[in-house]
């Protein structure tokens, strides 16, 4: 009988932990948010920039090869195209360098982040207080049950 009561007590102790443990869900939501709004967007933008860089680089290589083999007025046009493609490649590289510059968060975003941190801290404090209340209540109930059980043993004259 005492073993069953302690098992019930242990199970009751685990209930608030199971009910209030939302870490897995919250972590999943945070990861999904980051995936949707940062990773995908940045990856696609960077990928497009690298594709443009590849295309411009291959055009520059092909133009320099064609200008080396070309003769006459065609060679002049190819030389002009070669310089224009070089300027275009420099512009793309400058754009890539500018895209890599880290942006600072706006004040509104920083304030919202701070407010979320404060709400989280308050929630954790309240949660800890709730846990302590449950633990104290559980300990009191355990003591009451132990007293009742020992009184019952005395009344029934059962040896321990």
UniProtKB/Swiss-Prot annotation:
Component of the biogenesis of lysosome-related organelles complex-1 (BLOC-1) composed of Blos1, Blos2, Blos3, Blos4, Dysb, Muted, Pldn and Snapin. GO terms for cellular component: BLOC-1 complex; transport vesicle. It comes from the Eukaryota. Component of the biogenesis of lysosome-related organelles complex-1 (BLOC-1) involved in pigment granule biogenesis. This is Biogenesis of lysosome-related organelles complex 1 subunit 5. Belongs to the BLOC1S5 family. Coiled coil: none annotated.
């Amino acid at each position: 009988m005492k073993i069953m009561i302690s098992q019930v007590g242990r199970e009751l102790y685990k209930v608030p932990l199971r009910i209030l443990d939302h870490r897995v869900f919250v972590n999943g939501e945070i990861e999904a948010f980051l995936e949707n709004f940062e990773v995908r967007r940045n990856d696609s933008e960077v990928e497009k920039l690298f594709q443009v860089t590849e295309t411009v680089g291959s055009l520059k290589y092909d133009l320099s090869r064609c200008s080396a083999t070309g003769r006459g007025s065609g060679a002049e046009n190819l030389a002009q195209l070669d310089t224009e493609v070089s300027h275009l490649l420099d512009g793309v590289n400058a754009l890539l360098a500018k895209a890599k510059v880290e942006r600072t968060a706006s004040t509104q975003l920083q304030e919202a982040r701070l407010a979320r941190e404060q709400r989280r801290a308050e929630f954790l404090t309240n949660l800890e207080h709730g846990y302590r209340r449950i633990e104290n209540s559980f300990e009191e109930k355990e003591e009451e049950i132990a007293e009742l059980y020992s009184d019952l043993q005395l009344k029934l004259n059962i040896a321990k």
